């Protein structure tokens, strides 16, 4: 597994992690596939995908609960990231969300806590002060964002007194390259990691006769798979 540094930290994370949207259900809990999904997460860990990203929104917290089950006995081997719902972007809302996530994840700290979406109705200063408080209290190790524009990242960073935003999780794949306009250049300029979600466009990147033919030709030339080509 290729590895990379997380932002301006000394933390090394795998280049490919496990996204947990759909694990445990969609937006409500669904226990029917728990056993299979736990095995899938465990296999991913065995293959080196020790970064696991979830959210309190996924399956109404059940996704976090499954990650908590998987992490039992090997918490120190994992880098666990989670997020909170935008309606909870207030100071009090974030503190309460963090406590719920800690319980769901069966852990006493979250490696990377991310603001899932900006919420224009709640001042970013209030949001980031709560994030900084969680770091100061030892409940969160690093602060991240998700779905933030470059300007929104700047506004968020300017609020923080002594902490840094180490990442921004955004959609990025062969067919959605919007972040290359301003988000990616900004992240590179401040050494903040871009965590790409939907890197295969939910499977669509390797679907379709023309796409498959092109990716297959490149894959054969480089002894890779079409999916590896799409990600690289």
Description of each model-found segment:
Residues 118, 122-232:
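Beta/alpha (TIM)-barrel catalytic core signal, keyed to glycine-rich beta->alpha loops juxtaposed to Asp/Glu
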Residues 30-44, 90-105, 153-154:
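Short, acidic/polar
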Residues 11-16, 48-51, 74-78, 107-111, ...:
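Short, well-ordered coil/turn segments that N-cap beta-strands
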Residues 6, 18, 52, 67, ...:
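Conserved, mostly hydrophobic/aromatic
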Residues 1-78:
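N-terminal binding-site loop/beta-alpha segment at the start of enzyme catalytic domains
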Residues 8-10, 68-75, 99-106, 135, ...:
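Acidic (Asp/Glu)-rich catalytic clusters
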Residues 105-121:
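Active-site groove signature of glycoside hydrolases
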Residues 77-89, 112-116, 170-171:
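A short, structured active-site edge motif that brings together acidic residues
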């Amino acid at each position: 597994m290729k590895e990379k540094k997380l932002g301006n930290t000394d933390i090394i994370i795998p280049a490919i992690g496990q996204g947990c949207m759909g694990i445990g259900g969609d937006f409500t809990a669904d226990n029917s596939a728990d056993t299979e999904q736990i095995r899938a997460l465990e296999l991913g860990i065995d293959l080196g995908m020790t970064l696991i990203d979830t959210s309190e929104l996924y399956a109404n917290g059940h996704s976090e609960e499954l990650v908590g089950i998987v992490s039992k006995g090997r918490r120190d081997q994992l880098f666990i990231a989670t997020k909170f719902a935008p309606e909870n972007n207030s100071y009090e809302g974030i503190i309460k969300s963090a406590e719920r996530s800690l319980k769901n994840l069966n852990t006493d700290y979250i490696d990377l806590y991310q603001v899932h979406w900006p919420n224009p109705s709640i001042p970013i200063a209030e949001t980031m002060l709560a994030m900084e408080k969680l770091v100061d209290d030892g409940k969160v190790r690093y602060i991240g964002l998700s779905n933030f524009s470059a300007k929104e990242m700047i506004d968020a960073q300017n609020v923080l007194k002594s902490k840094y935003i180490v990442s921004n999780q955004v959609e990025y794949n062969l067919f959605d390259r919007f972040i290359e306009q301003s988000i990616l250049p900004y992240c590179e300029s401040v050494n903040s990691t871009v965590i790409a979600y939907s890197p295969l466009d939910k499977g669509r990147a390797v679907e379709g006769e023309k796409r498959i033919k092109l990716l297959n030709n490149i894959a054969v030339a480089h002894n890779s798979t079409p999916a590896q080509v799409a990600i690289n």
